[in-house]
């Protein structure tokens, strides 16, 4: 049985036409439909022409949002030796080695991002069942397995995000807050599009971009004209 929509959602859906909107118009409409009583995130959902069950069609990488994420990212670091001090000085919220691994193993996950140095990954790998489903497992592709902790912490705190295509080939990403100006949201969305194009999997055949929708956390889905976004040139 289909879930009955609230009157609020019904009213918001009526504002959205069944068309692919020009990027700026879509973002303005997303802001207009962000009527919840909290600071809603700006979400983008992108369906790509890939089948991630094949290794050469997987997409997992990072993007730096030029206008930031609009939220404070809690960064935890698993390291040892002098790297512990480096991470602390760089502003990591949690730093540790065996003690932090033990806490995580008990289900204490009070961070949004986990970074680790390569030498501790054999121990971190044991946490895969806990971290993997939450998208928190450090990886070289995601920039979260590194010896340059200071740079990694700085970038992720400033708006760098790791993303991946799920098993159906869809990328789900938060690219800011609905309170951002349209211009800021557009800059961030353009950065996401360019990153996905730049990191096109070698095995991707045929039509790469299938559909792109944006929405507020509690708002209706709004289709964006993909070609218009890809052709868009932002003035610096």
Swiss-Prot record:
Entry-linked InterPro entries: Ribosom_uL1_bac-type, Ribosomal_uL1, Ribosomal_uL1-like, Ribosomal_uL1/biogenesis, Ribosomal_uL1_3-a/b-sand, Ribosomal_uL1_CS
Record flagged with keyword rRNA-binding: yes
BP terms from Gene Ontology: regulation of translation; translation
Pfam families in alphabetical order: Ribosomal_L1 (PF00687)
SUPFAM superfamilies, per database record: Ribosomal protein L1
PROSITE patterns in alphabetical order: RIBOSOMAL_L1 (PS01199)
Gene Ontology molecular function terms on file: rRNA binding; structural constituent of ribosome; tRNA binding
A cellular-component GO term for this protein: large ribosomal subunit
UniProt keyword terms in alphabetical order: Repressor, Ribonucleoprotein, Ribosomal protein, RNA-binding, rRNA-binding, Translation regulation, tRNA-binding
Keyword tRNA processing: no
Family: Belongs to the universal ribosomal protein uL1 family.
Record's function text: Binds directly to 23S rRNA. The L1 stalk is quite mobile in the ribosome, and is involved in E site tRNA release. Protein L1 is also a translational repressor protein, it controls the translation of the L11 operon by binding to its mRNA.
Subunit structure: Part of the 50S ribosomal subunit.
Database matches in PANTHER family: 54S RIBOSOMAL PROTEIN L1, MITOCHONDRIAL, LARGE RIBOSOMAL SUBUNIT PROTEIN UL1M
Name of protein: Large ribosomal subunit protein uL1
Species this protein is from: Synechococcus sp. (strain JA-3-3Ab)
